[in-house]
């Protein structure tokens, strides 16, 4: 049985950006470890809160997590959970060590996304947006250089912003030539335009023609929240949990735009993987999108008949896969209530949300599952879907 891991990461060396592009790094001050922690833990949440209502960001980080990181910043040991996840192993950023780590777990191939490699881009978008695309170019070339000679098993994901479509098409084309078969694209409007806006057609066409899968990953999109939800008398924990609930809307809105906007119909070779955004929303989502297309009972607010040739759920099964992450998702019963092959395996290595033992942990959860479910989940579905 082949095992394909559709969501893993580099844990880039702390000085990767300064080493990869010292001239650009000099124009964009380095984020501290504390700033990176805040960006990881509450960055997407914080951006939805008006500046006047924003509390101290460290107050949004759970007390124990904050204390552990404060000890780490003062020269102590890193958080045990991060150690256990493998973030400090050579396999976190060195290709030969990564391949040995994969071999020990029976993993054949991995898609690899950034960790701190994404931070210069986010930092630039807040402080020097004119440099943002250059930070992505720097990361994309660092990542493809890192796995050079191993792209048969280690599949680098380019990071793409659609704010400049000419740049996006050129970058995805260049990165495909360097071995990238996936592209991390924010599951959000770009340049205040929906993902199905005509301006983006050239990019979706290029991705489909190049055989580059689109990745909608956590942290690359957020569901809009009314700012008033943050104005609750100072209960930041309650607000944080509301924001966590809202994240399940991110993939639903992004996929809805791609389906109902006709993007998947116009580009049948386009492939999308939703990563680390949960799986428990899937059964309800599949039912809801098909109800929206049921012309026997048109809804008043739909305003017109559904005219695409396939049911929305059929576009999902043809062109979408959704991956799990161990600290968030339990396979059963969700995987029993969606079409076989829709939910696929990932380890999230070396992030704490995943597990180094993800293969065995998920294998145990699949005991007694329907025939073929295990093989499809671990690799058969992703292999056929991605053509790898």
What is each of the regions a protein language model found here?
Residues 9, 115, 188, 220, ...:
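Flexible loop residues that form catalytic
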Residues 131-134, 147-153, 160, 166, ...:
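Catalytic pocket-lining loop regions of alpha/beta-barrel enzymes
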Residues 126-130, 360-362:
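Short glycine-enriched, charge-decorated loop/helix-capping segments at active-site entrances
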């Amino acid at each position: 049985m082949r095992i394909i891991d559709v969501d893993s990461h580099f844990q880039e060396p702390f000085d990767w950006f300064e080493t990869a592009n010292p001239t650009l790094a000099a124009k964009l001050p380095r984020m501290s470890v504390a700033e990176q922690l805040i960006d990881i833990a509450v960055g997407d949440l914080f951006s939805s809160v008006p500046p006047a209502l924003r509390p101290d960001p460290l107050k949004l980080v759970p007390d124990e997590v904050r204390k552990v990181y404060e000890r780490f910043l003062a020269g102590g040991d890193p958080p045990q959970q991060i150690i256990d996840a493998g973030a400090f192993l050579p396999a976190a950023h060195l290709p030969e060590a990564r391949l040995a780590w994969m071999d020990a777990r029976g993993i054949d191939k991995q898609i690899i996304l950034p960790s701190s490699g994404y931070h210069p881009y986010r930092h630039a978008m807040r402080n020097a947006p004119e440099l943002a695309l250059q930070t992505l170019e720097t990361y994309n070339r660092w990542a493809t250089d890192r796995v050079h000679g191993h792209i048969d098993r280690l599949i680098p994901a380019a990071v793409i912003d659609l704010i400049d479509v000419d740049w996006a098409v050129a970058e995805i084309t260049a990165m495909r030539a360097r071995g990238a078969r996936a592209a991390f694209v924010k599951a959000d409007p770009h340049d205040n335009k929906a993902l199905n806006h005509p301006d983006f057609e050239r990019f979706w066409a290029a991705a489909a023609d190049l055989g580059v899968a689109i990745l909608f990953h956590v942290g690359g999109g957020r569901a809009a929240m009314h700012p008033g939800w943050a104005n609750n008398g100072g209960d930041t924990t309650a607000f944080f949990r509301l924001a966590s609930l809202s994240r399940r809307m991110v993939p639903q809105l992004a996929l809805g735009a791609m389906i109902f906007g006709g993007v998947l119909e116009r580009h049948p070779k386009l492939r999308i993987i939703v990563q680390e955004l949960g799986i428990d929303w899937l059964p309800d989502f599949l039912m809801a999108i098909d109800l929206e297309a049921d012309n026997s009972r048109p809804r008043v607010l739909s305003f017109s008949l559904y005219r695409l040739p396939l049911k929305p759920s059929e576009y999902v099964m043809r062109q979408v896969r959704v991956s799990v992450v161990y600290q968030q998702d339990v396979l059963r019963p969700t995987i029993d209530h969606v079409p076989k092959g829709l939910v696929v395996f990932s380890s999230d290595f070396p992030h704490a949300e995943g597990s180094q033992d993800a293969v065995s942990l998920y294998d145990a959860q699949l005991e007694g599952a329907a025939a073929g479910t295990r093989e499809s989940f671990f690799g058969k579905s992703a292999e056929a879907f991605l053509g790898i």
